[in-house]
């Protein structure tokens, strides 16, 4: 956790993502995440 210029608290997190020919897969989703684990490319 860090403080911003205006002294607000801020946090960062990252995901591990596998990029494939067909799209990508997020490997580090939590149970409460609302984004899809697999994102496909539309061709």
From Swiss-Prot:
NADP is among the record's keywords: no
UniProt record, GO biological process: proteolysis
Stored InterPro entries: Creatinase/aminopeptidase-like (IPR036005)
UniProt keywords, alphabetically: Aminopeptidase, Hydrolase, Metal-binding, Protease
The keyword Metal-binding belongs to this UniProt entry's keyword annotation: yes
Cofactor(s) in the UniProt record: Co(2+); Zn(2+); Mn(2+); Fe(2+)
Entry's EC annotation: 3.4.11.18
Cofactor note: Binds 2 divalent metal cations per subunit. Has a high-affinity and a low affinity metal-binding site. The true nature of the physiological cofactor is under debate. The enzyme is active with cobalt, zinc, manganese or divalent iron ions. Most likely, methionine aminopeptidases function as mononuclear Fe(2+)-metalloproteases under physiological conditions, and the catalytically relevant metal-binding site has been assigned to the histidine-containing high-affinity site.
Gene Ontology terms, MF aspect: initiator methionyl aminopeptidase activity; metal ion binding
Transmembrane segment boundaries: none
Catalysis performed (reactions): Release of N-terminal amino acids, preferentially methionine, from peptides and arylamides
Family recorded in the similarity comment: Belongs to the peptidase M24A family. Methionine aminopeptidase type 1 subfamily.
Function: Removes the N-terminal methionine from nascent proteins. The N-terminal methionine is often cleaved when the second residue in the primary sequence is small and uncharged (Met-Ala-, Cys, Gly, Pro, Ser, Thr, or Val). Requires deformylation of the N(alpha)-formylated initiator methionine before it can be hydrolyzed.
Quaternary structure note: Monomer.
The name this protein goes by in its record: Methionine aminopeptidase
Organism, scientific name: Klebsiella oxytoca
Name of encoding gene: map
